[in-house]
């Protein structure tokens, strides 16, 4: 039975006592005149008054928030009350409050949401506070907060009950405020440069746009399966075919894959496509975006990330894929281009290989094993193997290389971009190769998308496109090591209900 332990029952009883006193424990009648931050700013000058009593009894203000700390001292009490803008100290005196003080002492508790009216004053310790003249409980919290004023430290509980995490840990609120600022700043950056924000389908008849395993659902009215999108890429490029020369979308993608510190099955990305540009210009635009973000957010160019310090100074390093394998990963030059030699080298180094792989996939295995973990400062890796780049344009100089880059920061891929493949015949052959790979057991290989090939047949202008992971970007900017720390409600393993409200506690 819900709400069954004795402490919750006691709080429920106090709510009933409020009703008996003619007070609604879920009152909706209030007039808040100032947030806590506004109050502290408005009356800051009181702290510099020379008079012994630093107060302004003519200034009546009303505030509201959650009680985070409450201490009774005979005929007086002090409380710390928190709203979204911050914490404000409240002084309560029985002389001024009368019946309200009795109600406070008997029925109000940490966790309750209250409204308080009074005047500003400065305590003997120099803290600007509110001297209460009236107070009432707006919301009676019947579930006690954990550890009272000391915070919530159980990581798993923080993710499962994010509302509790936000109540107890102010720094978590700051992370998600910054995340919101990142998204709005990214949107503004592209709008200022003439990009059009669009919305494309979240349910696809064919999964495509990335090598990943999709989630499958069923459309009852149409009687067909649909796939939650793994990427919006093919729809966005259809729009470029249609004449929109610069488009972007900020939205969710879904991939039915494993979860770890940098992967969540649903995640936020921005993808953007720019006609008559190349991947070289995308790298420059990406650097410009980072400079814009750091300026708007007021961030220093060097940020901590775990035990590392990341230098975001421009320009970012650029290094070709194979050069990175040798110079950063230590793979011998004579091994990189030879399929059997590279396979043997990887096996010798303990890299697990599954099934038949071409030279490009083997190089990708080597990159993941030996290079990625060493990419701390922002680094563009360029000239990817064509085999692992089914939607990217072939290099004019070397048909085995794609005009593609990925940006790595803090050991993680942050973005992926390339000059788009706009040859419909080449795209058709690459889709056929992907289908063959899927039939051979590669679950992440892409499906044939005939309509997309047909769209290319109408002419896609030279175009460059890129996707940037918002979640991983926020991880970097907020020094969080887990993607769960930057997603309000991350995916978690299913477990039996563990709410403390279901447990009977012994006195």
UniProtKB/Swiss-Prot annotation:
It is found in: Cytoplasm. GO terms for cellular component: cytosol. It is an enzyme of class 6 (ligase). Its cofactor is Mg(2+). Its main location: cytoplasm. PANTHER family: LYSINE--TRNA LIGASE, CHLOROPLASTIC_MITOCHONDRIAL, LYSYL-TRNA SYNTHETASE. Homodimer. This is Lysine--tRNA ligase. It comes from Wolinella succinogenes (strain ATCC 29543 / DSM 1740 / CCUG 13145 / JCM 31913 / LMG 7466 / NCTC 11488 / FDC 602W).
């Amino acid at each position: 039975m819900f709400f069954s332990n004795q402490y919750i029952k006691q709080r429920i009883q106090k709510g009933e006592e409020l009703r008996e006193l003619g007070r609604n424990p879920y009152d909706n009648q209030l007039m808040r005149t100032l947030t806590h931050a506004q109050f502290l700013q408005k009356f800051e000058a009181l702290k510099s008054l020379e008079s012994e009593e630093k107060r302004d009894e003519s200034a009546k203000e009303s505030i509201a928030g959650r009680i985070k700390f409450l201490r009774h001292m005979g005929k007086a009490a002090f409380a710390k009350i928190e709203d979204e803008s911050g914490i404000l100290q409240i002084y309560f005196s029985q002389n001024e409050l009368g019946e309200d003080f009795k109600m406070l002492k008997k029925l109000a508790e940490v966790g309750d949401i209250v409204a308080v009216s009074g005047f500003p004053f400065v305590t003997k310790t120099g803290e600007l506070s509110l001297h209460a003249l009236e107070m009432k409980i707006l919301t009676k919290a019947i579930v006690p907060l954990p550890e009272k004023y000391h915070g919530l430290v159980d990581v798993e509980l923080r993710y499962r009950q994010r509302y509790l995490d936000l109540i107890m840990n102010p720094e978590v609120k700051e992370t998600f405020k910054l995340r919101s600022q990142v998204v709005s700043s990214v949107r503004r950056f592209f709008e200022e440069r003439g990009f059009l924000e669009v919305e494309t389908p979240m349910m696809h008849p064919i999964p495509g746009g990335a090598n990943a395993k999709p989630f499958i659902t069923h459309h009852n009215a149409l009687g067909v399966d649909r796939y939650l999108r793994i990427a919006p890429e093919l729809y966005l490029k259809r729009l470029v075919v249609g004449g929109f020369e610069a488009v972007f979308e900020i939205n969710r993608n879904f991939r039915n894959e494993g979860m770890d510190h940098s992967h969540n099955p649903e995640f936020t990305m921005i993808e953007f496509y720019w006609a008559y540009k190349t991947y070289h210009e995308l790298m420059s635009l990406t650097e410009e975006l980072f400079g814009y973000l750091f300026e708007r957010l007021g961030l220093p160019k060097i940020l901590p990330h775990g035990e590392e310090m990341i230098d975001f100074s421009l320009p970012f390093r650029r290094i070709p894929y194979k050069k990175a394998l040798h110079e950063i990963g230590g793979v011998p030059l004579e091994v990189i281009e030879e399929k059997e030699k590279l396979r043997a080298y990887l096996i010798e180094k303990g890299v697990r290989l599954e099934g038949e792989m071409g030279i490009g996939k083997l190089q990708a295995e080597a990159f993941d094993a030996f290079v990625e973990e060493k990419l701390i400062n922002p680094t563009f890796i360029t000239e990817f193997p064509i085999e692992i780049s089914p939607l990217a344009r072939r290099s004019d100089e070397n048909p085995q290389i794609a005009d593609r880059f990925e940006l790595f920061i803090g050991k993680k891929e942050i973005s992926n971009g390339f000059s788009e493949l706009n040859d419909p015949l080449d795209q058709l052959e690459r889709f056929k190769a992907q289908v063959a790979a899927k039939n051979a057991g590669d679950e992440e290989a892409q499906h044939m998308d005939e309509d997309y090939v047909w769209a290319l047949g109408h002419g896609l202008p030279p175009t460059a496109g890129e996707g940037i992971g918002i979640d991983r970007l926020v991880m970097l900017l907020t020094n969080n090591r887990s993607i769960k720390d930057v997603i309000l409600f991350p995916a978690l393993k299913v477990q039996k209900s563990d709410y403390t409200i279901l447990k009977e506690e012994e006195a």
